[in-house]
Curated annotation (Swiss-Prot):
Stored SUPFAM superfamilies: Actin-like ATPase domain (SSF53067)
Function statement: Catalyzes the phosphorylation of pantothenate (Pan), the first step in CoA biosynthesis.
GO biological process: coenzyme A biosynthetic process
Protein name: Type III pantothenate kinase
Protein source organism: Treponema pallidum (strain Nichols)
Alphabetically ordered keywords of this record: ATP-binding, Coenzyme A biosynthesis, Cytoplasm, Kinase, Metal-binding, Nucleotide-binding, Potassium, Transferase
Note on cofactor: A monovalent cation. Ammonium or potassium.
Record keyword Manganese present: no
Length: 273
């Protein structure tokens, strides 16, 4: 099955397989989201990249999409259908009743489907209360209690969003490459911005996880995901990083929900990564 995560920073394509009865996923490639591209342009690009990744047409017969970019949802779904001849299923609130996590009414109407997929993957893995941190366009924290109830979400500016905002919102600060400096004491402008944004985000993550644990009432597990989570891979005493968490969640959801109940290519999703 082809898995597609349409986010604000990347459109991530992966493929689902099984290893000893366990769901496993493999990321194939990433695209920059571009609302100006047509269905035909996306179809040609996706087909070429799938072939380069060794994925044949037969593997595209089933596709499952999460999207938090509504303007792109139908375009990409139709592009995949153009290649495979089968319309993908778009994950949305129609499926929430069939998940191992529960979403309370105030959250249900607004939570991004990518965050739901993250929560599913983490809860299936830990089988207990957990906090999921997603480092994307936004920095998000999703807290799940021991019963599988999503207690809430916190959203902050993501790393790239922060450095771009400093560049566009000031007269002299340059657009700084993202890197984790050794010290918070910047010796030049680039180092100073990296110290404040990247090191600062690291401290925010640690503090927010601790506060989520306090409000959940337990010292629960945590996991980090998202395209920029790699920046923290060298950190010790830090939660594990799982760059494939969203795709894993989609793979679990695709197996759990009766997708035949939904007319495919229904636009869904909310603000997310």
């Amino acid at each position: 099955m082809l898995l597609i995560d349409v986010g604000n920073s990347h459109v991530v394509f992966g493929i689902q397989g099984e290893n000893g009865g366990r769901v496993c996923v493999r990321e194939l490639f990433r695209l920059a989201p571009d609302a100006r591209k047509t269905q035909d342009e996306y179809s040609l690009l996706i087909h070429a990249l799938c072939e380069r990744a060794g994925v044949g047409r037969a593997s595209l017969r089933d596709a499952f999409i999460s999207s938090v970019v509504p303007v792109l949802t139908k375009t990409i779904a139709d592009a995949v259908a153009q290649i495979s001849g089968v319309q993908p299923v778009v994950f949305g609130p129609w499926a929430y009743e069939h998940l191992p996590v529960r979403i309370p009414e105030p959250v249900r109407a607004e939570i991004g489907t990518d965050l739901v997929a993250n929560a599913v993957a983490a809860y299936v893995h830990f089988r207990s209360a957990c906090v999921v941190v997603d480092c994307g366009t936004a920095l998000t924290f999703t807290a799940v209690d021991g019963t599988g109830l999503i207690q809430g979400v916190a959203i902050a500016p993501g790393l790239r969003t922060a450095v771009q905002s400093l560049h566009t919102g000031t007269a002299q600060l340059p657009l700084v490459p993202l890197a984790l400096p050794d010290s918070v004491l910047g010796k030049d402008t680039t180092h100073a911005v990296q110290a404040g944004v990247v090191r600062g985000t690291l401290f925010v993550i640690r503090a927010m996880i601790a506060q989520c644990q306090k409000e959940l009432g337990c010292r629960c597990a945590a996991v980090i995901t998202g395209g920029l989570s790699r920046l923290f891979s060298s950190e010790v005493d830090f939660p594990p990083i799982d760059a494939q968490l969203t795709l894993s969640g989609l793979a679990h959801i695709a197996r759990l929900v009766p997708t035949s109940l939904l007319p495919p290519a229904t636009v869904s999703g909310s603000s997310g990564n």
